[in-house]
Amino acid sequence: PEVLEKLLKALALQIGCEVSYNELAGLVGVSKQTVENYVQLLEKAFIIFRLGPFSRNLRNELKKLRKIYFYDTGIRNALINNFNPFDLRTDVGNLWENFMISERIKYNNSRGLDANMYFWRTTQKQEIDYVEEKGNVLSAFEFKWKKDSFKKPKIFLDAYPGSAIELVNKGSYKKFIGID
C-alpha cells in the first residue's frame, strides 16, 4: 500500500540517524502505533533492523530513540532512486555505516556469535556508530569512508573502562566483517 511505500522511503532517507516514530507517523499520515506495527513487520521480513541506544543510565546518554537500517542497501537505494557512485553521493557516510553494520550482523550470525548491538550518543551529541556487547566485552566502532582518524569520545572510555573504540574505514573494514 501507499502508506508502506511512504514509510519505507522515509526510513531509507534516515539511515544512520535517530528515528522518531512520532515524526514518521506525521510524515506518513498514520498513527504512531501503525508505524510501530509496520516497523515490526518489516523487521520480521528481514527488510530492516533496529539498533537501540546503549546506556548504563548515565544522565547525558540518549535512551529513547533508535536507528533503523536496511539489510540490503540495494533495496534502500532503489527506494530513494539513487544508484550513483560513491563519489557523487551525499549520503556516503550513512550508506557506509548501514553496510558495515548489516555485514557485521551477517558475520556474527554465520559464526553463531551472540551479540547485543547498539549505537551510543549523548545529549551533547558525542556519538559512536556501533557498540557491540558480547558477554562482558564491550567493543565500539566508528565508521568513516575516507577518514583515517577520528576523535574518540573520552566520556565513553571513562564511563566504560576496558572498552575499546575502533575506526572502520575502507582500508580496515575486512577485519571487521571477517574476510581478511
Where do the language-model regions lie?
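Accessory nucleic acid-recognition modules appended to NTPase machines
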Residues: 1-137
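Active-site ExK catalytic segment of metal-dependent nucleases
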Residues: 133-148
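Catalytic cores of nucleic-acid endonucleases
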Residues: 144-180
